[in-house]
């Protein structure tokens, strides 16, 4: 039995369409970055995302819209960091499992340079727009966390748009490594939950309580997502039996 999609819950509590170029999070749901991103994904011919980390909670929110975008032929590129191990393996497994190889998913690969960008770029038939600010992909950062983000287009500010977009292309093409199955397995094997993740998880839990009146049902999370993805891959390879060994409580 699966928990109701967190994006659907938010859509239920806020049905009024509201467009803004400045998003600040907080208690006013009109200031949530999530609503503007979801609307942009629905219309875009291609999507480029660059964030310093991905968390399972945020990926779950965007999966539905990204999947719909792929089904209508949109191209999606995502560049994220493995800096300090904040990116959760379960978030990467979700993307690979739900969206497949259609998404070009990569790690920034310069070990001696910090990586803290947060930007979302959407390309349409006649123009492109770019969100830039402080939000990585986590539930709290997309909703009620105090995060400041601003949106502009290549029509309103073409010079600075080109600076940001060209830098993204350079980083993506020349300073990254593809997150294929082997790279993901290696990252997951070496990953240790950083101390800061406890705070980020607490923020997401608090936001979940504030924005949802739904009674949560059981859904896979964390290492459970990794195990289920591995089982599905095993079935796809033709195996008829498998054994999962895990510690109690995983």
Show the residue positions of the predicted features:
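PLD/PLD-like phosphodiesterase catalytic module centered on the HKD motif
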Residues: 1-221, 225, 229
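Secondary-structure transition/hinge residues
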Residues: 176, 235-236
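Short, locally clustered residues in the helix-turn-helix/winged-helix DNA-binding domain
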Residues: 232
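Walker A/P-loop
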Residues: 236-250
């Amino acid at each position: 039995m699966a928990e109701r999609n967190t994006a659907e819950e938010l859509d239920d509590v806020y049905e009024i369409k509201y467009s803004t170029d400045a998003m600040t999070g907080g208690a006013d749901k009109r200031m949530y970055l999530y609503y503007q991103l979801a609307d942009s994904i629905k219309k875009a011919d291609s999507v480029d995302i660059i964030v310093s980390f991905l968390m399972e909670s945020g990926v779950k929110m965007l999966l539905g819209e990204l999947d719909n975008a792929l089904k209508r032929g949109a191209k999606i590129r995502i560049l994220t960091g493995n800096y300090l191990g904040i990116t959760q393996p379960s978030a990467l497994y979700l993307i690979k499992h739900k969206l497949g190889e259609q998404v070009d998913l990569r790690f920034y690969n310069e070990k001696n340079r910090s990586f803290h960008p947060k930007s979302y770029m959407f390309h349409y038939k006649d123009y492109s727009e770019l969100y830039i600010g402080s939000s990585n992909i986590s539930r709290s950062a997309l909703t009620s966390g105090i995060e400041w983000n601003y949106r502009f287009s290549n029509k309103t500010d073409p010079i600075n748009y080109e600076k940001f977009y060209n830098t993204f292309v350079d980083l993506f093409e020349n300073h990254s490594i593809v997150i294929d199955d082997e790279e993901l397995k290696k990252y997951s094997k070496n990953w240790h939950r950083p101390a800061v993740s406890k705070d980020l998880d607490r923020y997401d839990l608090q936001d979940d309580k504030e924005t949802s009146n739904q009674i949560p049902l059981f859904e896979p999370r964390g290492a459970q997502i990794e195990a289920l993805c591995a089982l599905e891959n095993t079935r796809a390879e033709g195996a008829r039996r498998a054994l999962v060994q895990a510690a109690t409580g995983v």
